[in-house]
A protein has these predicted regions:
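Domain-level signal for Mg2+-assisted phosphodiester chemistry and nucleotide/NA-binding surfaces
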Residues: 1-103
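Nuclease catalytic cores that cleave nucleic-acid phosphodiester bonds
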Residues: 73-206
């Protein structure tokens, strides 16, 4: 794992690609429940961080997501909010198990690489199987790579000797409240309560 602060020269591009399905799944697993508004990432804060990272260079922010049949009305406000703060959105129908957007993310990174002005890639994902090898190849080509995500799940980036890593919660303003991240691996000496994932009364609900 390397440091992530890389000053950019004028004309260079810093590209953020955000794997929405993977990040949503990781956050839900971390919380043990569907996140409330306090625990949903603020993309305006992510955008400001990206602009600071790009300096005088070009900052490009893209979110890649799947849209399942029947969910259009639920997803539309979120997509419009992203576009309103300067993020481009690549939306793909989730019609089969093979409708993932990993290959689309890699295709877009490759497109920008071929254009010749790509200085740094920031990938928001914990999917090491899809991204570790291609991202390390970018580093060998002289492009800086940073992964942002949750340290509990983005272990591939932390284990890499050439990929930078930044925990999403370390970026100023991304979360309105601290995430409840107490785990068995991070217990204080005095011990800590681990809250239930659901109400005890849910045992009475019909499955």
């Amino acid at each position: 794992m390397t440091d992530v602060e890389v000053p950019q020269s004028p004309g260079s591009r810093v590209l953020l690609v955000w794997d929405a399905p993977n990040m949503d799944m990781s956050l839900g697993s971390l919380l043990g429940a569907r996140p409330t508004s306090a625990y949903r990432p603020r993309f305006d804060a992510v955008g400001r961080w990206l602009l600071e990272l790009a300096g005088e260079g070009v900052a490009e922010a893209c979110v890649f997501t799947n849209v399942t049949p029947g969910s259009t009305e639920v997803v539309r406000p979120w997509v419009e909010a992203l576009r309103n703060v300067g993020f481009a959105v690549f939306a793909k129908p989730k019609v089969t198990d093979d409708s993932d957007i990993d290959s689309d993310m890699l295709d877009h990174i490759e497109l920008r690489r071929k254009e010749g002005d790509l200085a740094q890639v920031v990938v928001a994902s914990g999917d090491g199987r899809a991204f570790r090898s291609p991202l390390e190849a970018l580093v060998r080509d002289g492009i800086d790579v940073t992964v942002i995500g949750f340290r509990e799940y983005a272990t591939f980036a932390q284990a890499s000797e050439v990929i930078g890593f930044r925990d999403l919660e370390e970026i100023d303003g991304v979360f309105r409240e601290p995430l409840p991240r107490m785990t068995l691996d991070s217990l204080p000496d005095e011990g800590a309560w681990l809250q239930p994932f659901r109400s005890l009364r849910s045992l009475l609900e019909k499955r």
